[in-house]
UniProtKB/Swiss-Prot annotation:
PANTHER family: NON-HOMOLOGOUS END JOINING PROTEIN KU (PTHR41251:SF1). Pfam families: Ku. InterPro entries: Ku70/Ku80_beta-barrel_dom, Prok_Ku, SPOC-like_C_dom_sf. This is Non-homologous end joining protein Ku. Belongs to the prokaryotic Ku family. Keywords: DNA damage, DNA recombination, DNA repair, DNA-binding.
């Protein structure tokens, strides 16, 4: 089955516009998913909204969004009021500015999406926008209504296409960088000439290998599928595996641990 686009609209840079389509770069379709079942009847359990105080079900047309003022009071907002704050980014990715590629820290990146031309007429404009960003070493910044909310997005030329990243909101990113940078003092072991650094560098060299997608394969999914297949065939489930306990030995220092690690790899 062909991948279905999750969004269609227009990519715009100043007066240059082209129709585009977009789909998530990652998928959860291969993930094992479960439903909650009534053990007694075998029927599926469904959820519904109920009043927190009375417990009575609340019909769809009686549900409204509210912003909490305190524990028991809310500012209610109607759909019309929420729609009034929407911008023109529902169907147009209007690149507002460009920033040097690599200048945005990893912590801002959220979810990747593939962006591509939606018809043959827009292929040339799309290709020029992509190539110009690549040649200049820049990425584009825009805003887009996606998944029912407006998001800041980054457009990155990659290969022959463009990857659109949703970005975290400014108030969602913690200030001050990594906590370790503020709390951990520098160590002499971190210097390039220290024995610890030399041994760990040697260990890294021995364990370096080309990237392979199998490195991020989820073994839990495979075990779940095995259990499900066994249940379907009427077999008993396999006993739960016990987590392997790390070997402690007599290692009492970083240097001893590194030497022991290298020795396991056949070096001394």
């Amino acid at each position: 089955m062909a991948d279905r686009p999750s969004w269609t609209g227009y990519l715009k840079v100043s007066l240059v516009t082209c129709p585009v389509t977009m789909m998530p770069a990652t998928t959860g379709s291969e993930t094992v998913r479960f439903h909650t079942i009534n053990r007694r009847t075998g029927h599926r359990v469904v959820s519904r909204y109920v009043d927190a105080q009375s417990g009575a079900p609340v019909a769809d047309d009686e549900q409204v969004l509210g912003y909490p003022r305190d524990d028991d009071h809310y500012v209610l907002l109607e759909d019309e009021e929420l729609e009034s704050v929407a911008l023109d980014s529902t169907r147009t990715i209007d690149i507002e500015s460009f920033v040097p590629a690599g200048s945005i820290g990893w912590v801002w990146y959220d979810a990747p999406h593939f962006l591509m031309p939606d018809d043959t007429i827009g292929v040339e404009a799309f290709a020029v926008i992509r190539a110009a960003m690549e040649a200049a070493g820049m990425v584009g910044i825009a805003r887009l209504v996606l998944y029912r909310r407006e998001r800041a997005v980054l457009l990155e030329p990659r290969g022959k296409g463009i990857v659109l990243w949703t970005l975290h909101d400014g108030n969602a990113v913690r200030n001050g960088g990594h906590p370790a940078a503020r709390t951990r003092p520098a160590s002499e072991a971190e210097s390039a000439d220290s024995p610890e650094m030399k041994l760990l560098t040697a260990l890294i060299d021995r364990q370096t290998q080309p990237w392979d997608p199998e490195m991020v394969r989820d073994p839990v999914q495979e075990r779940l599928l095995d259990i499900i297949a066994a249940r379907q065939k009427g077999r008993k489930r396999a006993p739960a595996r016990e987590a392997a306990k790390p070997k402690t030995g007599n290692v009492v220092s970083i240097l001893d641990a590194l030497r022991a690690s290298l020795a396991q790899d056949g070096t001394s």
